[in-house]
Amino acid sequence: MDKYEVKLSFIIVNFNGISDTLELIDSVYKANLKFSHEIIVIDNGSKNNEFEAIKMRYPSIKGLYHNENLGFAGGNNLGIDIAVGDYFYFINNDTLLPQEASAEIAGMMTFLTMHPWVGGLSPKILFGEPENTLQFAGSTPLSKLTLRNKQLGYGELDKGQYDELKSIPYLHGAAMMLPKQVIQRVGKMPAFYFLYYEELDWSVTIGQAYELFYYPGAHIYHKESASTGRDSPLKMFYLSRNRIIFAARNCKGSDKIFALIYLVFLAGMWQALKLTIQGQLTLLGAHLRGMGSGISWVQKVR
């Protein structure tokens, strides 16, 4: 396909998750999309070269195998380098498109075309199980102190109560669509986060020049933390690390000082105490290493 004919580029990062990735690609084909598109898979340092196995099943896909895990942002950035579509749709490999995806995704692209001041969209995100349960229907801003926010609709049954288009402060990393020209202007994802908070930081950067929206006219299914696991040491390390980095990069003046004090000396130590009492020493170690790594990163870039 000539690169000028491609309307949409799906960008998918795979890490030891070939089963989920194949299921996602199956859902793309089953949706019988009515617009030109390409599927890009970045195998981000899997133990085996899973890209070649995926390519054998679906010869038309594009992508590559990278022998080092570059993290969520780094993998997506490799996809950006390859993609030629007018719009980039970043979707986690543990998501599934619905059968209605053709019309819904076309609607997202039309909305972005008609509103050039919009920098990105995230659709309604539903859990794979239980059925019809919301994961994401927009979000509140992050607290300036705790660096936490609320995902609207989380855990609720989808009864149409979040079917209103709304401006949001942050895109959801499991599913976000951006025009290529927006990325050309603001740059690629900040790869130093490796995992977690990179889409929040990117959203802050995009939001300085554009507006971001929750787009309920489209939806996707997400299996949640199939790739990292709930409360895994990996997840604990990077959440503890990256909250500190995000605060240092995006909070200003006294807000930054108070946020860092809270994250390190209040929330950080309280988390450590809880994990100690619970006897979760592996998670405790990951948490403390994460905080130490975050503090070290901040000191290096001062």
Stretches found by the model and what they are:
Residues F88:
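Short aromatic/hydrophobic "clamp" motif used to bind/position activated sugar donors
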Residues I18, S27, D43-F51, E68:
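A conserved acidic beta->alpha catalytic loop
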Residues M1-K30:
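N-proximal low-complexity "stem/linker" segments adjacent to membrane-targeting elements
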Residues L96-F136:
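Conserved donor NDP-sugar-binding/catalytic core segment of glycosyltransferases
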